[in-house]
Amino acid sequence: IPGNRAIAYSAKSKYSRIKITGIAENAQSKVGDEIVVAEALLNQVIAEAGISDHFIVETFIGSELAGTICEHPFKGQGYEFDIPLLAADFVEMDTGSGFVHIAPGHGSDDWELGIANGIVVPDTVGGDGLYYKDVPIFAGIHVFKADEVVINNLRDSGALLANGKITHSYPHSWRSKAP
């Protein structure tokens, strides 16, 4: 999340904006919240997020998201920049929400999408795997030990819908285990 500079979506897929009208006891969302989710993943997302009831406000094709700008979830904590939504062919509809967090300094797809759209590529992590001292919230934390800090800050900012364990590839040296 510290390196996030955009969010990718599928221009060809359908998305639904839903209004949450019921939640499970331990849900992160609140009744009245509205979220946008890929239509193909809606049932999976509401189950994982503990959403017990909702209604669909609208359904639309992803290309209608072009030009949408979001706030970084850590705005007010050193992340004072806009997060554009960008169409990308690599967004898949088999897991997640139908959106992909884009950190152009941390992956080849992210890099290519960022560069193609004039997104600044931040330098956030040193060769030792530690976030640089000028990275707000995460300074000095190793990337493989930042999960709890990310989750807690997302929760505190009201931007956490659900959390769980996933396997995610990250560019690093298999020999040294350093990013």
Which role fits each region the language model picked out?
Residues I1-D128:
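NTP-handling and nucleic-acid-processing catalytic cores
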Residues Q44-I51, D156-T167, R175:
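A broadly tuned preference for mixed-charge, low-complexity surface segments
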Residues P73, L113, N117-V120, V149-S157, ...:
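Generic, well-ordered alpha-helical scaffold segments in large soluble proteins
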Residues Y79, A159-L160, P179:
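Intrinsically disordered or highly flexible coil/loop and linker segments, enriched in small
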Residues F99-H101, K133-V143:
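The substrate-binding groove and active-site-proximal loops of carbohydrate-active enzymes
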Residues G127-Y131, H168-P171:
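Short linear loop/turn motifs
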Residues H142-Y170:
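Phosphate/diphosphate-binding loops
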Residues H172-P179:
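Cys/His-rich short segments
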